[in-house]
């Protein structure tokens, strides 16, 4: 069994001149885009633990994919330090980025993001391409601005 590299145990220094930092910043920033999450789910389903048979009820714990486990561990590692103020200050969309990283900690969510309904809820757009009522209400109410907790609540109901 290969030992993890020592440099991944510690987050990179938070400086834009550090190549590893900028690479990870670009990756976590891209996770704020629900359509990028959909792209990952469709093109790399094994990384997210999505069954190749397409049966969403199929969960095979006996033969868990080592790539999916490694990717889940990498996401946990990223979330552990990007949520801190030292790092989150560099995010252009910290709310959406940290929400995506938090949701990606859940195995069920990683499997469910292949479903268009989940992606559309994250994007705040219904399947007809119109802005959802919840999203419209958030934009019209200043106190709710930036609060997207309804995605997490609705996630389990899809």
Swiss-Prot record:
Subcellular location(s) of the protein: Nucleus
MF (Gene Ontology): transcription coregulator activity
One GO CC annotation: mediator complex
Gene Ontology terms: biological process: regulation of transcription by RNA polymerase II
Annotated signal sequence range: none
Main location: nucleus
A Pfam family of this chain: Med31
Alphabetized UniProt keyword annotations: Activator, Nucleus, Transcription, Transcription regulation
Chain intervals for the UniProt region annotation (Disordered): 130-158
Assembly description: Component of the Mediator complex.
Assigned protein family: Belongs to the Mediator complex subunit 31 family.
The protein's role, per its UniProt record: Component of the Mediator complex, a coactivator involved in the regulated transcription of nearly all RNA polymerase II-dependent genes. Mediator functions as a bridge to convey information from gene-specific regulatory proteins to the basal RNA polymerase II transcription machinery. Mediator is recruited to promoters by direct interactions with regulatory proteins and serves as a scaffold for the assembly of a functional preinitiation complex with RNA polymerase II and the general transcription factors.
This protein's name: Mediator of RNA polymerase II transcription subunit 31
Organism phylogeny: Eukaryota, Fungi, Dikarya, Ascomycota, Pezizomycotina
